[in-house]
């Protein structure tokens, strides 16, 4: 049986990504790409020009939608929105820096940082929660598009959760998988299951300002 190739990408930079100190940006922040983010998306589109995508999917968040539309370019494809790939719900910690979180929520933040895989963001989701809503959808797409290549534009925590599962990492270590804005991960889905071929490829945006 032929394999399915999945290009799993992160959206381009937003104003929140560029904030220093770093602030959390979950699923209740729905701003557009920054000027630098649009440049990153254009660089991603150039990289993907020759990739024969059969279908393209994205989170409903505006930053993912804009990145995906840029990546599709002139292809005669309709972008399909998948809520399963929406960014993690970070609850009460939205738009807060970690210093602010530790100061305002000392007990809850200590619990989260001690076990970031299963303890949820305060009032939100955990990495395990994200895996539960993304992995079944990803597998369904892999079997639906056997023998083809598909693209997915998602988010930092979403990508980390998916990749940690495929790499068979303990979920608490998902946070150690870096995902640059507009990075590319390539997953080959075989009859025996998924394999990661490329992880956080970002050479196409290295000449642009880097953010978290």
Language-model regions, residue ranges each:
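Phosphate-coordination/substrate-recognition cap region in phosphate-metabolizing enzymes
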Residues: 3-5, 42-110
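Active-site signature of alpha/beta-hydrolase-fold catalytic machinery across serine-
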Residues: 70, 161, 165
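An N-terminal RHG(E/S)-centered segment typical of histidine phosphatases
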Residues: 1-53, 69, 96, 191-212
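Beta-strand elements within well-structured catalytic alpha/beta cores of enzymes
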Residues: 4-9, 148-154, 158
